[in-house]
Amino acid sequence: MKASLLNKLDVLSDRFEELTALLGDAEVISDQTRFRAYSREYAEVEPVVALYKQLARVQGDLEGAQALLKDSDPDMREMAVEEVRETKQQLVELEAQLQRMLLPKDPNDGRNVFLEIRAGTGGDEAAIFSGDLFRMYSRYAERRGWRVEILSENEGEHGGYKEVIARVEGDSVYGKLKFESGAHRVQRVPKTESQGRIHTSACTVAVLPEPDEQQAIEINPADLRVDTYRSSGAGGQHVNKTDSAIRITHLPSGIVVECQEERSQHKNRARAMSWLSAKLNDQQTSAAASAIASERKLLVGSGDRSERIRTYNFPQGRVTDHRVNLTLYSLDEVLAGGVDAVIEPLLAEYQADQLAALGE
């Protein structure tokens, strides 16, 4: 293992000892804020340090076995050869585990998200496909026990959506969906196509982590134009009698967000402000992410909205993710919510990128 990684592990071991002492300190115990913060850090550091101690024990076993290779007894030497082989294999596995545990964690992985799906080229067929994508993510959310809440929708004339915005709430939503941002292309024969010709349409997907209070960008109220209007969304007759829907324009950036699904104007405004904050955060971080991706030539993770990331080919029942050259002939299962079949290889590729960077 590289000296730089061993140094990191030594620092973590020292920190673990500090945390153990701090969590037993009466002054810390009486301060619940500090106690919770130290407890969270302890929970993160403890498994890494435990594995590092195991690595040290196995390293000691290897040195002992190597010493026995010089024993005058041939039986002992034969046993030592086998033990050296086994302990070396153990060391390789433990080092790989430790490297994965040392990978930098994305602080947004545990967050809820704003999911934006927009029809692109292809007219009505693109809008219908937007509906298919939204249904796919909704079913995936059901499988994972997440909650999906539509904030804004603009339905297509023949079904689907010209645009649909939703908030997805649950455990590690961003960590799972963060590589879904980009252009999704569909190839199929539209129902209105009498000649049976395959048409190509596209939709764009954006996945934005919902910021917490510490992350939220401070927005000057003078930079906002707030419009109210009558909602055309869900909620029955009541919503059409009051101007409960909210549209907020951030004048410096030109970003517009709107929320129309709640009956309460106050709730719609709160959701819209949270979404605006997420979009402003995304604007800041996207440029940095693109620069890093370009510099390191990452296959996954640039998050460029215009990048074609996936093709759904209906005649062949095929899904292809172009970033990792993944092709699956299980289109129906993926669209039914089995998105993990695509997401897991992407996450594995991203982890491989990180491991390569860790070793640089």
Curated annotation (Swiss-Prot):
Subcellular location as annotated: Cytoplasm
UniProt superkingdom: Bacteria
Main location: cytoplasm
Keywords: Cytoplasm, Methylation, Protein biosynthesis
Residues annotated as transmembrane: none
InterPro entries, A to Z: PCRF (IPR005139), Pep_chain_release_fac_I (IPR000352), Pep_chain_release_fac_I_sf (IPR045853), Prokaryotic/Mito_RF (IPR050057), RF-1 (IPR004373)
Gene Ontology molecular function: translation release factor activity, codon specific
UniProt PTM comment: Methylated by PrmC. Methylation increases the termination efficiency of RF1.
Modified-residue entries (N5-methylglutamine), positions: Q237
GO CC terms in record: cytoplasm
Keyword Transcription regulation among UniProt keywords: no
Family the entry assigns: Belongs to the prokaryotic/mitochondrial release factor family.
Reported function: Peptide chain release factor 1 directs the termination of translation in response to the peptide chain termination codons UAG and UAA.
HAMAP family given in the database record: Rel_fac_1
Stated name of the protein: Peptide chain release factor 1
Organism, scientific name: Pseudomonas syringae pv. tomato (strain ATCC BAA-871 / DC3000)
Gene responsible for this protein: prfA
